[in-house]
Regions:
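Pre-Walker A adenine-sensing motif
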Residues: 139-151
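Gly/Thr-rich phosphate-binding loop signature of adenosyl cofactor/nucleotide-binding cores
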Residues: 2-88
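Glycine-rich phosphate-binding P-loop
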Residues: 155-170
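Glycine/proline-rich, flexible active-site/cofactor-binding loop segments
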Residues: 136, 143, 160-161
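Structural motif
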Residues: 55-58, 93-96, 116-117, 157-159
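Residue-level recognition of alpha-helix initiation/capping sites
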Residues: 100-102, 142, 166
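Charged, amphipathic alpha-helical linker segments immediately N-terminal to NTP-binding catalytic cores
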Residues: 91-96, 100-137
């Protein structure tokens, strides 16, 4: 069975230069295991079938405008469902607001209650998504370790493999 890899949210925040709006949430213990991200537009509209909450949730201009139009009470209700988790879905590792969008204080309090980090970036949504997906694909890529020596024999590369300590380099 293939080994699965993870990356800490703390490392992602540092690498992507994200602002942690919920400073009281311990991001060092949160691990990201999926390379995909999700824009929760359908979830904000109340549709939670097939919701992959294990992904980083990204709020862009479209989602933010929708939340503003629906009002704060409705937004808090939907975001609580997203953040609280249930028997059908887990809590997301984090929610990222792009384009330096405004985050209401009540939403920050809700995120703190459920220990879901709210992060913010100045980057445009599509640019941020492309960057984070590329970075996660590298960090979470499958790996293979072998004991071996590479040689150049008459211009051809040769890999000699074997157990450690059997004299491959002799």
């Amino acid at each position: 069975m293939a080994e699965t890899y993870s990356v800490s949210l703390e490392k992602l925040i540092e690498q992507m230069e994200l602002e942690n709006v919920t400073g009281d949430v311990d991001v060092s213990r949160i691990e990201i295991v999926q390379t995909d991200v999700n824009r929760p537009a359908l979830q904000l509209a109340g549709f939670f079938d097939y919701f992959d909450s294990g992904r980083i949730q990204i709020i862009g201009h479209v989602e933010h405008t929708y939340m503003e139009q629906k009002g704060l009470d409705y937004t808090l209700e939907m975001m609580e469902i997203i953040m609280a988790g249930s028997e059908r879905h887990t809590k997301p590792p984090c929610i990222v607001f792009c384009r330096d969008l405004y985050i209401d204080e009540k939403l920050i309090q809700l995120a703190s209650k459920y220990q879901v980090p709210l992060l913010r970036t100045k980057k445009e949504t599509n640019a941020f998504m492309a960057e984070v997906i590329r970075w996660l694909n590298v960090e979470l890529a499958p790996r293979c370790s072998v004991h071996g020596v590479l040689l150049d024999l008459f211009g051809e590369g040769v890999l000699i493999m074997g157990e450690s300590g059997i004299g491959k380099s002799e």
